[in-house]
Structure formats: structure tokens, C-alpha cells
From Swiss-Prot:
Entry protein name: Carbamoyl dehydratase HypE
Family (UniProt): Belongs to the HypE family.
Physiological role: Involved in the maturation of [NiFe] hydrogenases. Along with HypF, it catalyzes the synthesis of the CN ligands of the active site iron of [NiFe]-hydrogenases. HypE catalyzes the ATP-dependent dehydration of the carboxamido group attached to its C-terminal cysteine to a cyano group.
Xref: Gene3D superfamilies: PurM-like C-terminal domain, PurM-like, N-terminal domain
Domain of life: Bacteria
NCBIfam families cross-referenced by the UniProt entry: hypE (TIGR02124)
Key word Lyase present: yes
Annotated InterPro entries: HypE (IPR011854), PurM-like_C_dom (IPR010918), PurM-like_C_sf (IPR036676), PurM-like_N (IPR016188), PurM-like_N_sf (IPR036921)
Reported consequences of knocking out the gene: Insertion mutant lacks any hydrogenase activity in symbiosis with peas, but is still able to synthesize the polypeptide for the hydrogenase large subunit.
Species, as recorded: Rhizobium leguminosarum bv. viciae
Length: 350
């Protein structure tokens, strides 16, 4: 029996090997792949048990669940890769409910011919991101498709967390007079991915803002949870899509100030060069919070005190508007309607 186990666990040739169809066929090669890359990267008691599912205990409160898929191109970009993005994005979706993320799952669809060294790099960084966040990946799946039927690797995730009783953040809860706060500069992720995709170089390196926001959210809830109406992470479609979604769901309008919106000069310059509206550009480490006016100062102070919130700003207010428009006062003193993005400005950004 020991000889069989030893033979079964032969090491992968990660440096030179590539994915082939046998790695998804359920046999020895698949076992070697799971042991040699995924279990090594995500190592924890649940995965070591070798079951097709994981059992876990949860604390009191309301359970929150999310699921997401990641198809970003390129797979590696300044500030992260598809693996770190999958961990951070799933954690953030849970955190936007004011919940504490507890567990993740991850499923990989891998194209035949994909280099094992790249898969190991993705898995290792994904494991490191989950450990840094304190949210383990406790179950998963691997499938392999024929060459040309995918683009390297796609990742699907799910996450589970717990929201404390009494905290009910909903996208239909914005009310006229509420403050609109963003936790930092906009557009970093979308521009970082786009510049890598198009092989563009700028005088200053632009890196993705991909980060797990649950620690920041916990500080915000502690400082003024009773006053927070809702939180959203402005990913695809940027803050323009996020504000329009909230306006439609809450049946209100927004009035925001362009000069108050934080944005790095190099990101602004890159957007101008690429012909992008930064309001439509994706973010992966920022949040938008709508807060009752009496709690805005306390929540903003809590964000500023966190390492991920140094550039946070109050950028506008909720207004009564039967048309549910998002209006912006421009830097020139004029006004414009910030509409939904038409078409696809940045495909496969996450």
C-alpha cells in the first residue's frame, strides 16, 4: 500500500510541463496535479481530508453567499493576476453586505497546453492572498478542455460569510441627503490591465488596486454601522455603473462633484490617451458607501485611518430625482449626466 501511495504521488515536472487532457480525466495525472499544485498552494485541513466537499461551522448571524467568474486577459498584470483577483473579488462581494468572509471555493477550467509553471504561479499567489485575508479555500474542482476551447485558464469562485444581526445593507436603501463616499482613487485596475494588454508603457507604473476590503469594512461598521445604508465595490463599469444601479434600485438620483473624485494623475493621463472615461473604468480594491448624513464624518474618518483608505473622499450626495439620474458638476463648473456605459469599453477586465 505504501509503495502504491509513493508511486501515485510522483512529482510534476512543473518547470517544463504543460496541462494535457489526462490532468482532467480523474486518474493518476489529475491526482498529481491536485496534490502538486492546488493542495500545496491552498494547504489546509479541509483539503488534506481529500473529500469532494467540506463541512464547517459558522458563527451566529445571517449567512451571506456569493459566486463569481474570472476571465481576465492577460492573466498576469501589474499588481496581481487572475488568482489574486478571484480571491479579492469574492471576499469583497461578501464584505459589501457588512459580512465577515469565512470560506471560499475555487473551480478551474484549464486549457490543454497551459504551462504548469504559470498554473503554479496563479495557485500560489491565490493561496497567499487567501491566507493573508484569513479566508481559506476549502473545496474546489478542476476541469481540462481541449486546446483552443478556452484561453489559458478561467476561475469560478464562491464565498460564504456571516453578517451580524441588525446590519442590513441593501442597494434600495439610499435616501435623499445621504452622503456618497469612495474609499480611494478610481480606475487603477482597469488601466493596469489595459496597459498590459496593449503593451503600453507610461512614465509612472500603474498597478491594479486589487485588494481584500473586509478589514476596511469592519472598521467602517464599527465606526458607524447604524448609519451605513449600503456599500458596493465598483468593478465592471466603474463608479458610473455602480451609482446608476443604486439610483435605479433606490429610486433616487445622485449629484457628485468631479473635482472631489480621487484619481491618480498617471491614471487620468492614461485614460485620456486611451480614450477612456475613468468613471467607467473598473476598480478591484475600492468601495462606494452611501451613508446617512449624521454618520458620514465618522465613517469617512474610519476609512482614512485604514491603510486602504488614505485617499478616501466624500464625492457627492443622494438627491430626489424621478428620473434616477446621476448628475456630475464638472471641474469647469458645468454639469453632465453620468450615464450607464454603452457597449463594452474594457472587455475581460476581471
Amino acid at each position: 500500500m505504501n509503495m502504491m501511495i509513493k508511486a501515485y504521488k510522483r512529482k510534476l515536472d512543473v518547470a517544463n510541463g504543460r496541462i494535457d487532457l489526462s490532468h482532467g480525466a480523474g486518474g493518476r495525472a489529475m491526482g498529481q496535479l491536485i496534490e502538486g499544485i492546488f493542495h500545496k498552494a491552498f494547504d489546509n485541513d479541509w483539503l488534506r481530508a481529500g473529500n469532494d466537499q467540506s463541512a464547517f461551522s459558522v458563527p451566529g448571524g445571517r449567512m451571506v453567499m456569493t459566486t463569481d467568474g474570472y476571465v481576465v486577459s492577460p492573466l498576469f498584470f501589474p499588481g496581481g493576476n487572475i488568482g489574486t483577483l478571484a480571491v479579492h473579488g469574492t471576499i469583497n462581494d461578501i464584505a459589501m453586505a457588512g459580512a465577515v468572509p469565512l470560506y471560499l471555493s475555487a473551480s478551474f477550467i484549464i486549457e490543454e497546453g497551459f504551462p504548469l509553471v504559470d498554473l503554479e504561479r496563479i495557485a500560489d499567489s491565490m493561496g497567499a492572498a487567501s491566507r493573508e485575508a484569513g479566508v481559506p479555500i476549502i473545496t474546489g474542482d478542476t476541469k481540462v478542455v481541449e486546446r483552443g476551447k478556452a484561453d489559458g485558464v478561467f476561475i469560478s469562485t464562491a464565498g460564504i460569510g456571516m453578517a451580524p444581526d441588525g446590519l442590513d445593507l441593501r442597494s434600495d436603501a439610499a435616501r435623499p441627503g445621504d452622503a456618497v463616499i469612495i474609499s480611494g482613487s478610481i480606475g487603477d485596475h482597469g488601466v493596469a490591465v489595459m496597459s498590459k494588454r496593449e503593451n503600453l508603457e507610461f512614465d509612472t507604473d500603474i498597478v491594479s488596486d486589487s485588494a481584500a476590503l473586509h478589514g476596511l469594512v469592519a472598521d467602517m461598521v464599527a465606526a458607524g454601522g447604524a448609519h451605513i445604508r449600503l456599500m458596493r465595490d465598483p468593478t465592471r463599469g466603474g463608479i458610473a455603473a455602480t451609482l446608476n444601479e443604486i439610483a435605479s434600485q433606490s429610486r433616487v438620483g445622485f449629484r457628485i462633484d468631479e473635482e472631489a473624485i480621487p484619481m491618480k494623475p498617471e491614471v487620468a493621463a492614461a485614460c485620456e490617451f486611451l480614450g477612456l472615461d475613468p468613471l467607467n473604468v473598473a476598480n478591484e480594491g475600492k468601495l462606494v458607501a452611501v451613508v446617512a448624513p449624521e454618520g458620514a464624518d465618522a465613517v469617512l474618518a474610519a476609512i482614512h485611518a485604514h491603510p486602504l483608505g488614505a485617499e478616501a473622499a466624500l464625492i457627492g450626495h443622494v438627491v430626489a430625482d424621478d428620473n434616477y439620474f446621476v448628475q456630475m458638476v464638472t471641474s469647469f463648473g458645468g454639469g453632465r449626466i453620468v450615464d450607464w456605459l454603452s457597449g463594452e469599453q474594457l472587455p475581460r477586465i476581471c
